[in-house]
Amino acid sequence: MKAVRERVLAVVDDDTRVLESLEDLLESAGHTVHLFRSAQALLADEAFGRIDCVISDIGMPAIDGFELERLARAARPGLPVILITDRLELIKGRQTTARDESRTFLLKPFSERELLGAINKALAARQRP
């Protein structure tokens, strides 16, 4: 039987409460979680090369979630990025196309099931040839 590798997730948000809440949820689901208060912190961290999926707030100072997605994909093509926000207007017209399954949007508040489902879908899409 093939062993399942533990997934390494990065959560990026400037709100400490969101970071802590998502850390608890994702660790309880069996993932290794790295927390970052800014996009710059993630991109500069040595763990960036081992991240399997990024979960990032869109509305952050300096580098927002869209720019983080662009920079992360430039460094690591195909890296799944899940963008979260409580502002629907930020994601209107930017929904995922059939060609780009590595981009996912979640509107806050989202359920545990929605987030874990989005992570599983993003990781499965990345593993397809």
Residue spans of the language-model regions?
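Active-site residues of response regulator receiver
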Residues: 57, 85
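Two-component/phosphorelay signaling modules centered on CheY-like receiver
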Residues: 16-34, 100
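C-terminal output helix
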Residues: 110-122, 127
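Conserved phosphotransfer cores of two-component systems
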Residues: 45-49, 71-79, 100
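Acidic catalytic/metal-coordinating carboxylates
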Residues: 37-38, 64-68
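Acidic, metal-coordinating helix/loop segments flanking the phosphotransfer/catalytic sites
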Residues: 35-53
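As written
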Residues: 65, 95-106
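Receiver (REC) domain active-site loop signature in two-component systems and cognate sites
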Residues: 60
